[in-house]
Regions:
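Internal mixed beta-strand/loop scaffold within catalytic domains of large alpha/beta enzymes
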Residues: 1-27
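Charged, compositionally biased interaction regions
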Residues: 30-309
Length: 309
């Protein structure tokens, strides 16, 4: 069974319209660069972009492909296991046909998703593997899964904001608490009074760059965005809810967030819509002198541990 994502869905729709099976290969047990590249999607990479080129760039070497045995398709040469098959036209089954639980699999928000009524079927034609293959996969919603999913989120936001206001957005972290998609922490640098308010424009651009994003937390350049304690510290000491919260109701977001349903709020017209929110935890530029972090002298460790390296 398969539940294809774009752009693969485009190919399956074309094949089904022609009444033809779509040959596909599934490579299991590949190197980390390939798994990371597989997470990329629009707008970071447009439809039709070859994500394997990202994997090649990350590993400094092209990804080797090999011809499948039973179908006219290629597979990743050094995969532990390769499943060869065809996506059958006009064939559908319930996603939970084996369990009958009404549930499918653990999803990135941390909940088990509802089983789809009808998903496409793959007819397996061959399985090839290395000697003593290792079945290695990523199961969500763990840290590994959501951190990989966050990479294209971060890339999309950095790219769009940098083009609009060069040098202002220093870094982005698609926080694992949001599954790498729903929550982003933006580190913004205000260099002059004219930059006040631009941090909020950066947050709006982030929503445009990655439509699945739900919440943005804005912090200053002296806050470590990869340290949740530091981010929460900024929220406690540099944020006032009545003036630093910006809400944008009725915006398309992600249907796997169970709170994004009409039953949760009358402002949600249909599943997958949300109230997007900006939490501005940056210091107003004219008050920066009141928000200097405590500094401590550097400690020469070798005074106490002469052999310390």
């Amino acid at each position: 069974m398969a539940n294809a994502r774009p752009p693969y869905r485009c190919f399956s729709h074309k094949a089904e319209a022609a009444g033809q099976p779509l040959p596909i290969s599934i490579s299991i047990g590949v190197d980390p660069a390939i798994e990371i590249a597989a997470c990329f999607e629009p707008p970071t990479t447009p439809l039709g972009f070859n994500e394997l080129s990202i994997a090649g760039a990350l590993r400094g070497k092209a990804v080797e492909m090999t011809q499948c045995k039973t179908i006219n398709e290629k597979a990743i040469a050094h995969a532990e296991i390769v499943i060869e098959g065809e996506l059958l036209p006009n064939a559908r089954v319930r996603e939970d046909q084996n369990t009958h639980t009404g549930r499918a699999m653990p999803e990135f928000p941390g909940y088990t998703g509802e089983a789809k009524e009808a998903i496409p079927v793959i007819k397996v034609k061959a399985v090839t593997h290395r000697i003593n293959p290792i079945w290695r996969t990523t199961v969500g919603p763990g840290e590994e899964h959501v951190n990989m999913a966050g990479i294209p989120t971060e890339a999309s936001i950095l790219d769009m904001v940098e083009r609009a206001m060069p040098g202002k957005l220093l870094n982005v972290f698609a926080h694992s608490a949001g599954g790498g998609k729903l929550l982003a922490v933006l580190q913004f640098k205000k260099s002059s009074p004219a930059d006040e308010g631009r941090q909020r424009q950066a947050a709006l651009l982030a929503f445009s760059a990655f439509p699945e994003l739900k919440h943005v937390i804005l912090v200053d350049e002296d806050v470590d965005i990869f340290d949740s304690d530091d981010v929460l510290w900024a929220m406690q000491t540099r944020y006032q809810g009545d003036v630093d919260t910006i809400t944008i109701p009725g915006v398309r977001c992600h249907p796997l967030d169970p709170s994004q349903v009409p039953e949760y709020s009358p402002s949600i017209l249909q599943q997958g819509m949300s109230c997007k929110t900006i939490f501005d935890c940056t210091v107003p530029f004219h008050l920066k002198h009141n928000f200097q972090r405590s500094r401590f002298k550097e400690v020469d460790v070798k005074r106490f541990l002469p052999d310390f390296e």
